[in-house]
Design a protein with these regions (language model features):
Chain B
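ABC transporter nucleotide-binding domains
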Residues: 2-7, 12-207, 213
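Short beta->alpha junction loops/turns
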Residues: 66, 234, 238, 268, ...
Length: 282, 312
């Protein structure tokens, strides 16, 4: 038998192998380049405002930074990164069926999923952090926000919230990638359909979203910025907000992520990842 | 018999389709051919043995243990799949390197193992080229190489000869025989009888998800020799040939054409003897004769109709 074949699966080594393998796969994908470009794209907005808006009513750098960080980076780009970067490591192996080579080797399924997830977190966090950093610098040019402890603290907090978003959305994406054949479609419906709708539905439906907890971690309270109301011909319905403390929000997202990662591992162990059925099978 | 692989009433179905039905076999060490036409259930059997599928009923054990998600068992199994599943833009070397890492080798050892495996299948020259540039035969070699990477004790080769040129086939035949001689268990799946015959004399006949026979290939050959056949004789005078053959009571029906005589016989050996006599007499020229149904499908049909009890 092989000179260095392990007797039993080594969790650490398997995780490391899966992590580095996922890095090499992800970094050479066109999808990665596309998402890198999208992540730095919001930088042009403050630059555009600085160059072309001359009125006294133009938005300040601080306002633009907050809006871009919250609405573009955290609410839009984190779920996008989770779906498009997160699914490279898992879904491509499943779609191309190269997963059968892995599943017939003594690699821990837990380590394989964790390694892939860590690689996704590293790459997606880096892209998000670079985007927010460049946007921050561009907004500083506009004024009312400075490169000081307050400014850097705010920027760091938004990066932190974004990373928590990547954690939550990423874990759900991984579970979808392992459990379903259409993770991107289901993910888009969940992240951009349900998540947005639930934040307007009166009651506590928003507690079943990641966005609720991310909003709770923002530097400024959500109630101070949003006036969520549904306007209809019968009148406007104001959504009552129930607050969650930032600490509870962090714990909740961590627990949700752990549950979904566990489910992803369970699906890898349970599912039969192979397409070539017998003749006549459906 | 020291059973390396053992199944008990193993069944697998996908929806309403039964891929494998109540299979109970014991596979010994050495090279064993898994012989059956396309869609017979060979790949399903292999995937069950590798733990890629869960049995719908019954069980399969490798060295006495269930294989699914069993790392101890997986570390001694090698698998060359029938289908091409690759990450196209990576090189053959890189593809194998990561699989070696997953098999538990450290980077240096992994590179050495990959080099050795690629040398064994003669792919060293092109090993840094992207897989997308490889021919069908090269891809097949890469698949074989990855299955040998970790020096497995039990190897499953699912239709490994597909797409290989004659030289590569010959090399693979020698490789498989060599592995068998080293004491390894090689399950060699094919739908071509003579391919299996080249590497082993022990076969499992599988058809429609059922194991028809497990035994020596000579016995299968005998069955082929003796089962009813359709023989096509090429001659300028088919009617006269038939008149000469009419003494053979095994012939059940005939068809005439301008140049061909097609006869259906219950005893092909006897009919071949008669044809030989006609040729030796030299009165009527016979240009050629051949069996029109000398394929596995007809053999299996014959085996099912004669050797499988009704109701199975």
């Amino acid at each position: 038998m092989g000179i260095q074949i392990k007797k039993i699966s080594n969790l650490y080594l398997d995780t490391k192998t899966s992590f580095y393998h996922a890095l090499t796969i992800t970094l050479r994908r066109d999808r990665f380049l596309l998402m890198s470009a999208i992540c730095v794209l919001p930088v042009v907005i403050p630059v555009f405002v600085a160059l072309f808006s001359r009125t006294v009513f133009r938005e300040s750098g601080l306002d633009i930074f907050i809006r871009l960080s919250e609405q573009i980076y955290v609410h839009t780009l984190t779920p996008l990164l989770a779906l498009f970067i997160g699914l490279i490591g898992i879904r491509e192996e499943v779609d191309s069926l190269t997963i059968i080579y892995l599943l017939t080797r003594p690699v821990s399924r837990l380590a394989w999923v964790i390694g892939r997830f860590l690689a996704y977190m590293l790459i997606a966090s880096f892209l998000l952090a670079i985007g927010i950093l460049f946007t921050f610098i561009a907004c500083v040019v506009l004024g009312s926000i400075h490169i000081d402890s307050i400014g850097i603290g705010m920027m760091s907090r938004y990066i932190g919230v974004g990373i928590m978003g990547l954690l939550g959305y990423g874990a759900i994406s991984f579970m979808l990638g392992c459990a379903t054949n259409y993770p991107i479609i289901i993910g888009v419906i969940l992240f951009f359909g349900w998540e947005k709708a639930a934040n307007f539905i009166p009651g506590i439906a928003d507690f079943w979203t990641i966005q609720k907890y991310l909003d709770s971690m923002f530097p400024v309270l959500a109630s101070q910025r949003y006036n969520r109301a549904v306007m209809t011909v019968l009148g406007s319905f104001q959504k009552e907000l129930f607050f969650v403390s930032p600490l509870r929000a962090v714990i909740t997202i961590s627990v949700i992520s752990a549950i979904f990662i566990f489910l992803a591992i369970w699906f890898v162990l349970w599912r039969e990842f192979t397409k070539d059925r017998v003749v006549g099978a459906r | 018999m020291d059973a390396q692989i053992e199944t008990k009433e193993l069944s697998k179905w996908f929806g309403e389709v039964v891929a494998l039905n109540n299979v109970s076999v014991q596979i010994p060490s050495g090279v064993v051919g898994l012989l059956g036409p396309n869609g017979a259930g060979k790949s399903t059997f292999i995937k069950l043995a590798l733990g890629l599928y869960r049995p719908s009923r019954g069980e399969i054990r490798i060295l006495g243990k269930k294989p699914r998600n069993n790392f101890q068992i997986l570390s001694i199994l090698g698998y060359c799949p029938e289908m091409d599943h690759f990450v196209e833009e990576v090189s053959g070397f890189e593809f194998l390197y990561w699989l070696a890492r997953y098999s538990g080798y450290h980077p240096k050892a992994a590179k050495k193992r990959v080099g050795d495996a690629l040398e064994r299948v003669h792919m060293v020259e092109r090993m840094y080229d992207p897989i997308s540039t490889y021919s069908k035969g090269m891809r097949q070699r890469i698949k074989v190489a990855q299955s040998l990477l970790h020096d497995p004790q039990i190897l499953f080769l699912d239709e490994p000869m597909n797409g290989l040129d004659p030289t590569a086939r010959e090399e693979l035949f020698h490789l498989v025989i060599g592995l068998g001689n080293e004491g390894k268990t090689v399950v060699f799946s094919s739908h071509v009888l003579h391919e299996v015959e080249r590497v082993t004399d022990t076969v499992i006949l599988i058809y429609n998800g059922r194991v028809l026979a497990l035994g020596k290939i000579r016995e299968i050959r005998d069955l082929i020799q003796n089962h009813p056949r359709t023989i096509v004789i090429e001659t300028m005078e088919p009617k006269k040939v038939y008149q000469l053959l009419s003494s053979d009571s095994n012939i059940t029906s005939v068809n005439f054409d301008t140049q061909f005589l097609t006869v259906h016989t219950l005893d092909p050996l006897q009919t071949f003897k008669c044809i030989n006599e006609i040729i030796l007499e030299g009165k009527i020229p016979i240009f050629s004769f051949h069996c029109a149904d000398e394929d596995l499908q007809s053999v299996f049909q014959y085996l099912i109709s004669t050797h499988i009890p009704r109701g199975l």
